[in-house]
C-alpha cells in the first residue's frame, strides 16, 4: 500500500493552480506592493487584523493562510480515518509547501499579500521579509496585543467550536504551545524591530484599536507595550461572557469531566454575587 501521506507533483500543481486562480479573483497587482506579516499567540484573534489591512489597501490584498490548505491534501479523508486528531501534523508538510509556492508565485506578480503567522520565532518573518524585499515589496508586521488569559480562553472556545463541527479532527491547542508564544513574542518583536526590515510594526487589540506603531514612534520598541498588554489583569466581569459561552459549548459537547470545564465552572461560581440571607419571619403575637 502506497504511503497516503505522499502526493504527486501533478496533484500538487493542479491544486496550486486552482488556488492561485481563486485567490486573484477581483485583485490587482500593483507597482509598489506591500506584504503584511501577522503575529500573535494562538487564540488572540489574528483574523481581526485583516480589517485594518483591508481598509489600508481598499480590499486589494490577498490573504494567505496555511491552515486553509491542510484539508486540500489529496488523501485528507483517508488520513483522517487513519490518524484522527493527529492528522494535522501529517498534512502540514503539504500545506507548508502550498503556502511557500503561493507566496512565491503571487509575489512574482506584485500582489499585496497578508501572510499569517504567530511570531513564535524570528527566523520565518526575517526570511520572508528579506525574500519579498528583494522582489520590491514594502514589508510590514501587524501583531495582536491581547491579555494571555483572553487568548488562552480563545484556544479553548475555538476547540469546542471545532469539536461541535467535527469531533474526529478537532484538535486542542496545548496550553504549553500557547504560553511559549506569549513568553517569546515580546522579545522576538523587539528583535524584528531592530532589523529594520519592517517599515511599520503595529500592535492592535481585539477591538481593532491601534496600540503602537513603530512608524509613529521609531525610537520606542514594541516590546514594552506588548508585554504590558499580555500581562494586563482582566476583571472577572470582562471574561464572564466568554466563560459562559465556553461552558455552554462544553456542556453540548459533553466535556463536563475535563479539568478545563471544572476550572471554568469554579471561576463562574466565584463571580456570582453572594446569596443574601433569608430574612426571618417575625413571630406574630400569640402564635
From Swiss-Prot:
Alphabetical list of InterPro entries matching this protein: P-loop_NTPase, Zeta_toxin_domain
Keywords (A to Z) from UniProt: ATP-binding, Kinase, Nucleotide-binding, Plasmid, Toxin-antitoxin system, Transferase
Catalysed reactions, semicolon-separated: UDP-N-acetyl-alpha-D-glucosamine + ATP = UDP-N-acetyl-alpha-D-glucosamine 3'-phosphate + ADP + H(+)
Keyword ATP-binding: yes
Gene Ontology molecular function terms on file: ATP binding; kinase activity
Active site: 67 (proton acceptor)
UniProt feature, compositional bias: Pro residues: 273-287
Other known facts: Has a long half-life in vivo.
Assembly, per entry: In the presence of the epsilon antitoxin forms an inactive PezA(2)PezT(2) heterotetramer. The heterotetramer is still able to bind the UNAG substrate.
Name of this chain's protein: Toxin zeta
Amino acid at each position: 500500500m502506497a504511503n497516503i501521506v505522499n502526493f504527486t507533483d501533478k496533484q500538487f500543481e493542479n491544486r496550486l493552480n486552482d488556488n492561485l486562480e481563486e485567490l486573484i479573483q477581483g485583485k490587482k497587482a500593483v507597482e509598489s506592493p506591500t506584504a503584511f506579516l501577522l503575529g500573535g499567540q494562538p487564540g488572540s484573534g489574528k483574523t481581526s487584523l485583516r480589517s485594518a489591512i483591508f481598509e489600508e489597501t481598499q480590499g486589494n490584498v490577498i490573504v494567505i493562510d496555511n491552515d486553509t490548505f491542510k484539508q486540500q491534501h489529496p488523501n485528507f479523508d483517508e488520513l483522517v480515518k487513519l490518524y484522527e486528531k493527529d492528522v494535522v501534523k501529517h498534512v502540514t508538510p503539504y500545506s507548508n509547501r502550498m503556502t511557500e509556492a503561493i507566496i512565491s508565485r503571487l509575489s512574482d506578480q506584485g500582489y499585496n499579500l497578508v501572510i499569517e503567522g504567530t511570531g513564535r520565532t524570528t527566523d520565518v518573518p526575517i526570511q520572508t521579509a528579506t525574500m519579498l524585499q528583494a522582489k520590491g515589496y514594502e514589508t510590514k508586521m501587524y501583531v495582536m496585543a491581547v491579555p494571555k488569559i483572553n487568548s488562552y480562553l480563545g484556544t479553548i472556545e475555538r476547540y469546542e467550536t471545532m469539536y461541535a463541527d467535527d469531533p474526529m479532527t478537532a484538535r486542542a491547542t496545548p496550553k504549553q504551545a500557547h504560553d511559549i508564544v506569549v513568553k517569546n513574542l515580546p522579545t522576538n518583536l523587539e528583535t524584528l524591530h531592530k532589523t529594520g526590515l519592517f517599515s511599520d510594526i503595529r500592535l492592535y487589540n481585539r477591538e481593532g484599536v491601534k496600540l503602537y506603531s513603530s512608524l509613529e514612534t521609531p525610537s520606542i520598541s514594541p516590546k514594552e507595550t506588548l508585554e504590558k498588554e499580555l500581562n494586563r489583569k482582566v476583571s472577572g466581569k470582562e471574561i464572564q461572557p466568554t466563560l459562559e459561552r465556553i461552558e455552554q459549548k462544553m456542556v453540548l459537547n459533553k466535556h463536563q469531566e475535563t479539568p478545563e470545564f471544572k476550572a471554568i465552572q469554579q471561576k463562574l461560581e466565584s463571580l456570582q454575587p453572594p446569596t443574601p440571607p433569608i430574612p426571618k419571619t417575625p413571630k406574630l403575637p400569640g402564635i
